[in-house]
Amino acid sequence: MRRLLIVGLVALSCGLIARATEEAAEAVPSFDEGVVPEAILQAAIEARDLPLGERMERISRPMLGMPYLVDAVGEGKLPDVDPPARYDVYDCLTFVEEVLALALPADPRSAPMIRNQLRYTGGEMDYTARRHFMLEQWIPENIESGWLKDITAEFGETHLIEKQVTPRTWSAWKHRRKFQLADHELPTGHYALPVLSLDAAIEAADQIPPGALILTVRRSRDHIPIIVTHVGFVVPSDDVPRMRHATKMGRRVVRDERLAWYFDHVRWYDWWQVAVSYTHLRAH
């Protein structure tokens, strides 16, 4: 039987949210004012006193059915002139970032500050500071900065997926040219993620709290720097555990899946073995 792995569960630190929210009250970028659609803004306002997982579900509910489009956001300036936020299309990461940015602060007008803290090193909106790569940047830097906490071990025996990334790894990668970064700006080093086996993940599925992020991870290959390929989150459900994500599968939209179905679907990918990760976010 093929083996699917589930990577580190993460929780959000409360103190950093509060600090970023206070800063955002004084420094909301003007280019984001008025961008959030009324239905999403109203959902964020009405849900702000709910537990975090429920807030994420309510806020993202109006996004269901929105088209999937990869790399639709940028800094509004060269080298990526796309706007910092869009609500008509999403890829998997921008969907998660936007939901978190709206769910975490008490006032959704603070969303740009929260988004920038999650997306950029130091919170500075600059292409070279963007956390382009999940394994090498987005996950470890958000853990180091205090936003995230790995809680994988709470749900079973963990294993490590390890990856050595060198300049040669980047030069051999066929998608290297898509990133407007100098060679020295690409992350290198040894990276590792704690994981659960698929069997352990399925067994623990009912224990995973709403708001937990799900990271899909492929088996490491020497010539490919990317192993984390997808992200979504667990939503509250009255019946079976479900995830919500912006996906290329099927109709290429934001949609919900039964976790059991999703695990069964990805376990049989023949062209690359896949892995999944849950991450939990602590409400403040």
Where does each model-flagged region fall?
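C-terminal soluble interaction/assembly domains
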Residues: 217-276
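Positively charged n-region of N-terminal signal peptides that target proteins for export
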Residues: 1-3
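Cationic-aromatic interfacial patches
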Residues: 24-94
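Acidic/His-rich structured neighborhood in mature extracellular/periplasmic domains
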Residues: 71-191, 209, 245
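Catalytic-site beta-strand/loop segments enriched in glycine and acidic/polar residues
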Residues: 60, 64, 68-79, 186-228
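Bacterial N-terminal signal peptides
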Residues: 7-15
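Conserved small/polar residues in nucleotide/adenosyl-binding loops
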Residues: 279-284
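Boundary at the C-terminal end of the N-terminal hydrophobic targeting segment
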Residues: 18-24
